[in-house]
Amino acid sequence: MQIRNTYLVFPFFTFVILFSLFIPFSQSFAGSESQSASDPSLILSPDKQFNYAQDLFSAKDYLTAANEYKRFIYFFPKDKRVELAMYRIGMSHYLSGHYQEAVSAFEKLTKQYFETEYSIKSYYKISEAYINLKAFDQALIDLNNLVIVTHDDDVRDEAYYRIGWIYIEIASWDEARRYFNKISTKNSYKYKLERLAAELDKEKVIPKKDPKLAGVLSIVPGAGYLYCERYQDALISFLLNGGLIYAAYESFDKDHYGLGGLLTFVGFGFYAGNIYGAVTSAHKFNRKETDKFIYKLEKNTRVNLSADLKNKGVLLSFRFSF
């Protein structure tokens, strides 16, 4: 009888212990649910998430901002600000110098939205990102795609204008003129095309050096450098090559054939370097003068584009040097 009572008491105490442990846990769980329901700060809302991403963007914490914009799009895909969030993702990458990632983000937007304010801006930013990557051909393709898809004359004219300046950047003057001429008459004053055409015509008088002539002149050591207006290099080349030639001649004249052969071998290397250096100097001279011309042209005539697609306008900014 005693043994039976023992078997009955043991399960009873086990049940009591387990029940007493479960009650606080269940109350804690229920309390946490009620706390989250009663505390609005713990609830993810579209406004809070978007504003948080905006604050990060304003603080120039671009990479974190991009992630928070992505989180906003993931949780609230039907929110009317999704397109803006996508654009800001692209801008976050662009402003942080990650141009290839920016291109991917902007392209994603242009595939999802058509002829909206931010899709058109995205086309422009894609071309600018490619320019920063020195991928000028890709920048031209992007803007030509915009020309094809848009039905807005103002947008098309701005694309033509941007294309023209890319061609100026790579010194393709005739192509630049061709695209500037495509701009409609109503926007010709907006982009100051008459003044631009007059300044662009000055490319014909950019100082140039002929690389072939520089090489031929270098038959006389230093003459090629002198032609390219590198006077110090011309003097050094003349003295060095002249000295080696004279030393080799003296060695052979005194029957020091080994020394003469060595000096001839060394001298030939310097002589070839004199020719190559002169040709390279001509190319550098031309690039430098072209860059100076492009810089002055941009400073004096380029319109500072600030897209205002709602009002169909641009902010015009000119700088003149005298």
Regions found by a protein language model. Give the residues of each.
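Short solvent-exposed coil/turn linkers within tandem alpha-helical repeat scaffolds
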Residues: D39-L42, I73-V82, T110-K121, V147-R156, ...
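Alpha-helical segment of the N-proximal tetratricopeptide repeat
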Residues: L44-K78, M91, L95
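Hydrophobic alpha-helical membrane segments
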Residues: L84, H98, Y118-K121, E128, ...
